[in-house]
Amino acid sequence: MQKIETILSDGNRELKKNKIETSNLESQILLSFMLGVPREYLIINSNLKLDDEKISKYRKLIKRRSEGESISNITGKREFYGREFSVSGNVLDPRPETELIINIIKEIYAKDVSCSVIDLGTGSACLISTLLLEFPNFKGIGTDISEDAINIAQKNAKEYLINDRVSFIVSDWLDAIDFNQFDILISNPPYIPREELESLPLEVLYNDPLIALDGGMDGLEHYKKIASNIKNKNNDKEKFLIIEIYENTVDDLFHYLENIGFERENMILYYDFSNRKRVIVSK
C-alpha cells in the first residue's frame, strides 16, 4: 500500500529519467486513466492509499511510456482545443500547433454564421469536430483514405453529439467529392519528405501511422493532388482553402500553387506559437 502522492512521485521520477519532458503531468494522466478518475481526484485524495495490484498496473503503464509509447496510444485519448478525442494507431495524434486552423477560422467568421466545410484527411476528426462545436451553424464532411480512421472519426462525432451535422466518406482527397458545395476546405495532409522520415523523433515514428506522415519524395505530393483537383473543379465561387504546411517546403509549395493559378496576393502565411510557418490560407 502506498499513498497516491508517493506513487505519482515515483512515476514522475521514472519518466523524467527517461527524458519525458512533461513527466509530472504524464504521471498524473496515466494514474487517472488507470483509476478511471479525473486528475483533480489525485490532488484532492493525495493521501489515499492504493493496493499493490493497482500500483503494479500503474508501473506497467509508466514502463510503456518510458519505452516510447505515446500517452494517446496508451489511453486512447488526445486533447485538442480543450477537448478529448478518441485516437488510435490508425490516426495521426492531434497536435496543438494544428489548433491554429481553428483560430484562423474564428478570425474570419462570426460565431453564428452558416457555412459548409470539408476536412480532407480527417483522421480523428478533431479539426472538423472542433469547428462544428465552436460554430453551431456549421455543417460538413470529413474524408479519409483509411476506413479505420473513418471509424474513429465517427466515434468522436457521436461522442460530441454532432453526427447530425457531419458525415464521413472514404475518399482519396477530393476524388469522391464535389468541392464546389463547400465554403471552406481544411486539411493537414502528410507533408514530411520521404528522405526525412527516418530523422523524425522515434516517438513519432513509433506511434503515428506512416501514411499520415509521408509526403512523397518532395513532401508536396498530397498538396499537389488537393490543389490541382480544386483548380480543375472550381466554379469561381469564393471559398477558403486552409492547409497546414511544413516550414521546410513552404517556398516550393508557394511556387507550385502560383504555377497552377493560385494568386500570391490571395495567399496568407500564418505562424504558430513557436514562430514556425504553419498554415496557408488562400481564397
Regions found by a protein language model. Name each.
Residues N137-K139, T143-K283:
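S-adenosylmethionine
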Residues K54, P94-E97, H222, T249:
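An acidic site on a long C-lobe helix of protein kinase domains
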Residues L8, S27-Q28, Y58-R59, G68-I71, ...:
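A general structural signal for well-ordered alpha-helical segments in protein cores
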